[in-house]
Curated annotation (Swiss-Prot):
Entry's transmembrane regions: 102-118
A Pfam family hit: PSI_PsaH
Residue interval of the organelle targeting sequence: 1-50
Lineage, top ranks: Eukaryota, Viridiplantae, Streptophyta, Embryophyta, Tracheophyta
Organism listed in the record: Arabidopsis thaliana (Mouse-ear cress)
Role summary: Possible role could be the docking of the LHC I antenna complex to the core complex.
Main localization, broad class: plastid
Subcellular location: Plastid, Chloroplast thylakoid membrane
Name of this chain's protein: Photosystem I reaction center subunit VI-1, chloroplastic
Gene: PSAH1
Length: 145
């Protein structure tokens, strides 16, 4: 199909043998030039140019905004949307848990105290195999176990 379009673009009044009518008669098919001509576009290979990649310079101290990104987009100078009393509560009581060591100690003490409480309140005979039979066995239909 593409070769047919290129022939039509080159020769406007071309006649192609054997395409129309009977192949035995050899009737000729005339092709009208198409309005949209096929124009191949020249493709040039351009190298990729980085803004800060010239001469192995990837970090520009004069232009830190473009080098590292605009970090002030994420910050906000607006007042806190939370209640001041709520903010004060969490700043006061959550401050000891900001350090990993203090949080780990709290979890160890909490887990140890929970384990101590559960072991002190549980009974030793929880499993039925340790309790044994609670009632005498019932005899079967023939008087046997």
């Amino acid at each position: 199909m593409a070769s047919l379009a290129t022939v039509a673009a080159v020769k406007p009044s071309a006649a192609i043998k054997g395409l129309g009518g009977s192949s035995l008669a050899g009737a000729k098919l005339s092709i009208k030039p198409s309005r949209l001509s096929f124009k191949p576009k020249s493709i040039r290979a351009n190298g990729v140019v980085a803004k800060y990649g010239d001469k192995s310079v990837y970090f520009d101290l004069e232009d830190l905004g473009n080098t590292t990104g605009q970090w002030d987009v994420y910050g906000s100078d607006a007042p806190s949307p939370y209640n001041p009393l709520q903010s004060k509560f969490f700043e006061t009581f959550a401050a000891p848990f900001t350090k990993r060591g203090l949080l780990l100690k709290f979890l160890i003490l909490g887990g140890g105290s929970l384990l101590t409480y559960v072991s002190a309140t549980s009974t030793g005979e929880v499993l039925p195999i340790k309790r044994g039979p609670q009632e005498p066995p019932k005899l079967g239909p023939r008087g046997k176990l």
